[in-house]
Amino acid sequence: MLRLLRLLLLLLLPPPGSPEPPEPPGLAQLSPGSPPQAPDLLYADGLRAYSAGAWAPAVALLREALRSRAALGRARQECGASCAAEPGAALPSQLLGAPHPVSGPGVWEPLLLRATLRRAECLTQCAVRRLGPGGAARLRVGSALRDAFRRREPYNYLQRAYYQLKKLDLAASAAHTFFVANPTHLQMREDMAKYRRMSAIRPQSFRDLVTPLYWAAYDTGLELLEQREAALALPQLEEALQGSLAHMESCRAACEGPEEHQGAEEEGEGSQGGLYEAIAGHWIRVLQCRQHCVADTATRPGRSFPVQDFLLSQLRRLHEAYAQVGNMSQAMENVLSVLLFYPEDEAAKKALNQYQTQLGEPRPDLGPREDIQRFILRSLGEKRQLYYAMEHLGTSFKDPDSWTPEALIPKALRERLREDQEKKPWDHQPPQQKPLAHWKDALLMEGVTLTQDAQQLNGSERAVLDGLLTSAECGVLLQLAKDAAQAGARSGYRGRRSPHSPHERFEGLTVLKAAQLARAGTVGRPGAKLLLEVSERVRTLTQAYFSPERPLHLSFTHLVCRSAIEGEQEQRMDLSHPVHADNCVLDPDTGECWREPPAYTYRDYSGLLYLNDDFKGGDLFFTQPNALTVTAQVRPRCGRLVAFSSGGENPHGVWAVTRGRRCALALWHTWAPEHSEQEWTEAKELLQEEEEEEEEEDILSRDPSPEPPSHKLQRVQEKAGKPRRVRVREEL
């Protein structure tokens, strides 16, 4: 415990001279010299003014709320740095492992607590000077408001208020700032398109007011390197690295604030046990938060996953750029810094040998960058404590770094952590393309033919197959969809305008709803049975074609019809279904696809089985990740299946249906059995129950004393049980 508390106080000391993060552009202080007001009150007043249509007061209050929130973070970081640099702030030598430490039980305790009290006094006085009396407590906000600021919601209100005030350039800046962090926000996507069509708005107004500047420097540096302008790229890359380290310091300073752990303490996690248990619990949460700052710094706004080895990637580019301009000493510093992360990195060792050869003489004075050495030593010290707590106190810790030496992890934890990393690798690995011969050997069903393979469709893991349905089977399923739509007013499942286009009507039917309607006599039972049989037919073929080594499970089955609304098709410019991927959020601007909600991340393969072709438009098309360049197009017809992997390698959309009614069976498959479609099983059981009841009725009809109808009805109701809830999801 003594060693743990020594390290605790050592790591509480941030490096002196930490750079101060700049205030976000566009948030100039509205009341110079005065301490900030409570951000929660300012934000609430701003929303009230917004709701009342008082646009100018709303703008002033919302901007002041943002400034006040930023002021607290700056004050906390500056106070931490200044208190650590004060004379006498050093810890007593006895707590730092001096050659002759104080002996005796409890002798170290007064020294530890005295140092803690002095630091607390310094931080409190600094907060009073920066924020006013009681400022730290007054400016504390709850988790809901912190989340709102993290999602940049104030900028959503600001853009609307600026628009009402006819300040279009400011509106565009606020809208762009919100959209960067919320790229899937459909309303803001439409608003951004409108702003870009306005000639009065200058192109430079579409700027992010919040994103740390190091991202812009990083992107600029990469672009210059691609253009082989290493001399111009170096200042940008250095700025990006220093900005990344400064952002990490700001994030770490925020970890020491009480509000970051308020939620855990409210749930009682930090209030159990005595003094030392409370200290250890709070300190562990601080360390967990600090370690997460690596991922926070490496995560672009609007993304949920960080850039892998972000600092390391910057160091690699720096040593290569310095070598290109002939600065071998700086190149050696940066490549030696790379080797601090991965000592056995072959590419880095090879580059180091080249640089040493070009220098011509040994340079013992050259070593890794000091800022990177401090970062690694501090990070390893924190990891060591977290793994100790994980082993002995039962806490949790997810290491954000892949470079952590295995020797640092206690042996008792290594196997457990290795098992956790090996769980469900298909959740993270994209499907691998298989040879063409494999595709042709997978056609097992009689009458099914391969019309186009992945190569002919200009992509990977996509195929078009014909012959899965006869014309009679297509007719049965089309009649099922028609009967279900006509029964919509009675069943509560009426058609409605498409969620993807106001110019089309959308009708959907799940397998369970079809079975329920069939049991009620609203639709024919043959159609409901065929829907189940066909979905299993598609699953079997998709598994044989794409995934013979691993079972696929139906995840969701949906019979969908889209009908063109008459009189609303002239000069139509939209799509029936916008370009998207099925298991990840597609970002056309960067070409990346993020496997995260709201996407159905557990989907692995998709299928579209078409029922008709007597309509205009409605072709399926695949695009490049930019969602603009069409790579392949497929015309629907009865019995044609388009099957493909569900990830970002297969962005797709549907052209507008401008006449007629387009019907298809949409199916999604998963490798994860826990995400298999439960409604499919329920629908099958429901139809089997009905068959059994009909057989029993046939037997009873030959019985001289049949059961009274009232008793029969009661028995059927008891057997059916409670009505099942129907999930209705708007799918392709």
UniProtKB/Swiss-Prot annotation:
Free-text disruption phenotype from the record: No visible phenotype at birth. Lysine hydroxylation of skin and bone collagen alpha chains is strongly reduced. In contrast, prolyl 3-hydroxylation is not affected, possibly due to complementation by other family members. Dorsal skin displays impaired packing of collagen fibrils, decreased skin tensile strength, and increased skin fragility. Likewise, mice deficient for both P3h3 and P3h4 display decreased lysine hydroxylation of collagen alpha chains, but normal collagen prolyl 3-hydroxylation.
This protein's record includes keyword Transcription regulation: no
The entry's keywords: Coiled coil, Dioxygenase, Endoplasmic reticulum, Glycoprotein, Iron, Metal-binding, Oxidoreductase, Repeat, Signal, TPR repeat, Vitamin C
Gene Ontology MF annotations: iron ion binding; L-ascorbic acid binding; procollagen-proline 3-dioxygenase activity
Carbohydrate-modified residues: N327, N458
Cofactor: Fe cation; L-ascorbate
Subunit structure and binding partners: Identified in a complex with PLOD1 and P3H4.
Name the record gives this protein: Prolyl 3-hydroxylase 3
Species for this entry: Mus musculus (Mouse)
